[in-house]
């Protein structure tokens, strides 16, 4: 099994991800997506939008503002309840999330336990029972566990006063809920229907870490699917299966993921069913997707605080009710990292070895690389590049031996290398090499576009 360090080193070396503000010593746990990283992440986002918005007869899109009226966050419960259990080491003063310290300590002993949902007293008892130590200095002396609100505060306007206090959104979902009526009316939607959006969110995490898995600035891909009360669990099962199948359709292996249902003690007070789709990272299991049946909690809260009526009148029965909501919430950065980890392989060949990223062609940063066999052939190869670049992200590489160029493309996950050789000038054909099998076939240049279009389908 490869390590997280190997993936991180490749990501930095090959231009997937760079440390943020690196020339100034960086800023803890901030990352910049490089040329290949942004292509990979954009492809993941496009694939999500295609499946959950474009191909769905039920769903439409939205792009709500990051900054919202602060009453939004009072209504949603974030101002009062969006907290993590914080604890400080008395010896080295390091600050930690108590629940994660306990889970890591139990995991090291081979005990699987979800601590989320326990009281502070129960957490404190577990820390004593299992002699939980500070990961920084090894001390077992901690302060009492206390609440820490995760929202970033800022001020709107020129005066820094409590009346001008606003927040960076901690999730994209609330922008959907407050626009429920706008979307429903303008798009003439009947239940069931969904609203999806992709956007940045911000959480002042106590202990971010594991590369891009847990960061304070992150991107979400969220769908809020509204339905009639009583039909919610049926739709919950539908979206849970759809989410899993989307991951499988893009090449994620069944063995690398699991579906974990929340027990009664772990469920949020407003939820009647929640499943986490988790991925087995080199550092352990981590949540990618939370699929939750949120009942009518969110719309009712906003009705109470805004006096806006979110009741829906059923056109067939004339029933009047507040819709229930199913929320599949996916972290764009997390799932991008998961696809990167799942694709990573160090392969031993007969007389050689190679590092290869086995991305599904739909996700690969470059769909193909154009490789002229000699610099004398650059003109003809450039014409092939120009034609394919109208429809696909393709690379052009004329530096080094053809073998080294193949290895470079394997390492960044390019599924097809297209070699333009001396015969290409006459027969208008090229050699296409498959990344995974390394097999090569001769193909007319005129067929390349259709070939790539077929391969990137999922």
Swiss-Prot record:
Binding-site list for substrate: 97, 171, 218-222, 327-331
GO BP annotations listed: glycyl-tRNA aminoacylation
CDD domains for this protein: GlyRS-like_core, GlyRS_anticodon
Residues binding ATP: 203-205, 213-218, 287-288, 331-334
EC number: 6.1.1.14
Coiled coil: none
A GO cellular component entry from the record: cytoplasm
Top enzyme class: ligase
Family matches, as Pfam families: HGTP_anticodon, tRNA-synt_2b
Claim: Aminoacyl-tRNA synthetase is one of the keywords in the record: yes
The protein, known as: Glycine--tRNA ligase
Organism: Bacillus anthracis
């Amino acid at each position: 099994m490869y390590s997280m360090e190997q993936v991180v080193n490749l990501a930095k070396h090959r231009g997937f991800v760079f440390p943020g503000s690196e020339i100034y010593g960086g800023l803890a746990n901030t990352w910049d997506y490089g040329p290949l990283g942004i292509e990979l992440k954009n492809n993941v986002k496009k694939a999500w939008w295609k499946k959950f918005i474009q191909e769905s007869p039920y769903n439409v899109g939205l792009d709500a503002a990051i900054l919202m009226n602060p009453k939004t966050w009072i209504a949603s419960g974030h101002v009062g309840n969006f907290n993590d259990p914080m604890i400080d080491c008395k010896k080295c003063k390091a600050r930690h999330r108590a629940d994660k310290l306990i889970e890591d300590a139990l995991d090291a002993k081979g005990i699987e336990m979800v601590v989320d949902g326990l009281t502070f007293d129960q957490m404190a008892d577990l820390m004593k029972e299992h002699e939980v130590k500070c990961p920084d200095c090894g001390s077992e002396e901690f302060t009492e566990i206390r609440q820490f609100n995760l929202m970033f505060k800022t001020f709107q306007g020129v005066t820094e006063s409590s009346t001008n206090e606003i927040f960076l959104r901690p999730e994209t979902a609330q922008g959907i809920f407050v626009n429920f009526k706008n979307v429903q009316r303008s798009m003439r939607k009947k239940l069931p229907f969904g609203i999806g959006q992709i956007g940045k969110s911000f959480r002042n995490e106590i202990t971010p870490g594991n590369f891009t898995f847990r960061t304070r600035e992150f991107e979400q891909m969220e769908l809020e699917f509204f339905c009639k009360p009583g039909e919610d669990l049926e739709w919950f099962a539908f979206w849970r299966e759809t989410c899993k199948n989307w991951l499988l359709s893009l090449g994620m292996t069944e063995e690398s993921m699991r579906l974990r249902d929340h027990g009664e003690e772990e469920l949020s007070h407003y939820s009647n069913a929640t499943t986490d789709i988790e991925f087995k990272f080199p550092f352990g299991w981590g949540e990618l997707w939370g699929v939750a049946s949120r009942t009518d909690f969110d719309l009712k809260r906003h009705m109470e605080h805004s006096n806006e009526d979110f009741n829906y009148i059923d056109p067939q029965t004339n029933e009047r009710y507040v819709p229930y909501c199913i929320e599949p919430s996916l972290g764009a950065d997390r799932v991008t990292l998961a696809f990167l980890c799942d694709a990573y392989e160090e392969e031993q060949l007969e007389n050689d070895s190679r590092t290869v990223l086995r991305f599904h062609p739909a996700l690969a940063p470059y769909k193909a690389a154009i490789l002229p066999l000699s610099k004398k052939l650059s003109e003809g190869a450039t014409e092939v590049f120009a034609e394919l670049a109208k429809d696909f992200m393709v690379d052009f590489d004329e530096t080094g031996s053809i073998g080294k160029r193949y290895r470079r493309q394997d390492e960044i996950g390019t599924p097809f290398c297209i070699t333009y050789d001396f015969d290409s000038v006459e027969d208008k054909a090229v050699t296409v090499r498959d990344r995974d099998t390394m097999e090569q076939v001769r193909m007319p240049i005129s067929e390349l576009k259709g070939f790539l279009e077929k391969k990137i389908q999922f």
